[in-house]
């Protein structure tokens, strides 16, 4: 039977890119303060948003009224969409193993 550890690995263990390094430098301290459950919810939320924003058939993303009422405004939504289009495989490759690790740990509790 495979043994899993609950010890945390640094984010750059999963993906060591300039974008990940900048993310760690900018938000690492705040992310460390989150509880385990909050980190799991954050990763899940990012993955779901990534899937939703990157779906070209999603009318919600194209809706100007939706975009104008987002927290970050239309420019940020459009910029995020461009980033997601270019980085989707890398982001999913980073987030999905983390979510799977949290799910395994939750199953053992």
List each model region and its residues:
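Short amphipathic alpha-helical interaction elements located at domain edges
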Residues: 1-109
């Amino acid at each position: 039977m495979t043994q899993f550890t609950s010890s945390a690995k640094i984010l750059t263990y999963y993906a060591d890119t300039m974008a990940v390094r900048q993310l760690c430098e900018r938000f690492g301290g705040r992310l460390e303060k989150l509880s385990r459950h909050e980190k799991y919810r954050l990763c899940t939320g990012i993955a779901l948003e990534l899937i939703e924003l990157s779906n070209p058939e999603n009318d919600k993303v194209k809706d100007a009224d939706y975009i104008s009422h987002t927290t970050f405004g239309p420019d940020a939504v459009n910029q995020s969409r461009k980033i997601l289009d270019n980085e989707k495989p890398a982001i999913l490759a980073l987030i999905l193993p983390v979510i799977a690790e949290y799910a395994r740990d939750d199953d053992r509790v």
